[in-house]
Amino acid sequence: MDQIVNVDEFQELAKQALPKMYYDFYNGGAEDQHTLNENVQAFRRIMFRPRVLVDVSNIDMSTSMLGYPISAPIMIAPTAMHKLAHPKGEIATAKAAAACNTIMIVSFMSTCTIEEVASSCNAVRFLQIYVYKRRDVTAQIVKRAEKAGFKAIVLTVDVPRLGRREADIKNKMISPQLKNFEGLVSTEVRPNEGSGVEAFASSAFDASLSWKDIEWLRSITKLPILVKGLLTREDALKAVEAGVDGIVVSNHGARQLDYSPATITVLEEVVHAVKGRIPVLLDGGVRRGTDVFKALALGAQAVLIGRPIVYGLAAKGEDGVKKVIDMLKNEFEITMALSGCPTIDDVTRNHVRTENERIKSML
């Protein structure tokens, strides 16, 4: 594993290790996959404005999220069904997160139970949720998470319906029975045609979910609530108005609406609307420590890593996940040093130049 030097190499190992159905499920995006590619490429169009002759002999990457200290502004995004990638599933991912002193957001669609993840290691973790048509199911899971010591709820708000993921349709992707829901609802679908995941989502997810439901969620939990899946100023303002505790700028890993903007291109729009009132996080397309720096320079408090974590898990289990996080942290530390930023607070908007700024400078 010492010879693996970047996320792309982990992706190639994951492709070799996984059955095609599972690799395509993790890796694929919606329809033409334009946004999937753009999430990554948009980062590459942002250039640095490094400062020199700054004392960077000691680099401090540490920060906090909702008051919980983390070793770097790199957290684990919620991704579904980790046991499809590795037999130990979310438990392996959780242990790696704990070893790296960061926060894992456990997926509502996890293959290990909330209690199994909670008892696997001592760490701060959040729970991502969907709201089902059967609200009692969502409520039970939230209450179990609270009891198990989870520290926040992350409500995904961009899935009134599942996006059209053509690889899953072609592969007849199965939806396995998830242990969290045993005795509550059947999640298993083995389709003769189409995607089983889409079939399950259509039957279970509540398409009537609206801003007023933040109140309902507040009524069933005392935990902080973040909303994940915002891409516009308008929705950011509504989120603040609804009293949420944080926002994740996300296009669901480009798995929902193709031709949605790359998240890094709309981050500033959301940050300017929020005006520092609540934390803004970002996911989508982060593949390098340089990407982490760019997101922070444009106003994010932290980034969430999705697919790279699954690639590490599929390739090398817990050690693979840890290696992915450590690589990104190392790249980020180098970027801070070479940009003249000894601490997170030193990373500013002046340290990057966006594509729009480059074009304007040529006019």
UniProtKB/Swiss-Prot annotation:
GO terms for cellular component: peroxisome. The lineage of its organism: Eukaryota, Viridiplantae, Streptophyta, Embryophyta, Tracheophyta. A 2-oxocarboxylate binds at residues 130, 165, 255. It is found in: Peroxisome. GO terms for biological process: defense response to bacterium; fatty acid metabolic process; hydrogen peroxide biosynthetic process. This is Peroxisomal (S)-2-hydroxyacid oxidase GLO4. Oxidase that catalyzes the oxidation of a broad range of 2-hydroxyacids to the corresponding 2-oxoacids, with a reduction of O2 to H2O2. Displays the highest activity with the long-chain fatty acid 2-hydroxydodecanoate and has intermediate activity with 2-hydroxyhexanoate, 2-hydroxyoctanote, and the short-chain hydroxyacid (S)-lactate (L-lactate). With much lower activity, it can also use glycolate, leucic acid, valic acid, and isoleucic acid as substrates in vitro. Cannot use 2-hydroxyhexadecanoate or D-lactate as substrates. A motif (Microbody targeting signal) lies at residues 361-363. It catalyses: a (2S)-2-hydroxycarboxylate + O2 = a 2-oxocarboxylate + H2O2; 2-hydroxydodecanoate + O2 = 2-oxododecanoate + H2O2; 2-hydroxyhexanoate + O2 = 2-oxohexanoate + H2O2; 2-hydroxyoctanoate + O2 = 2-oxooctanoate + H2O2. It comes from the Eukaryota. InterPro entries: Aldolase_TIM, Alpha-hydoxy_acid_DH_FMN, FMN-dep_DH, FMN_HAD, FMN_hydac_DH_AS. Its cofactor is FMN.
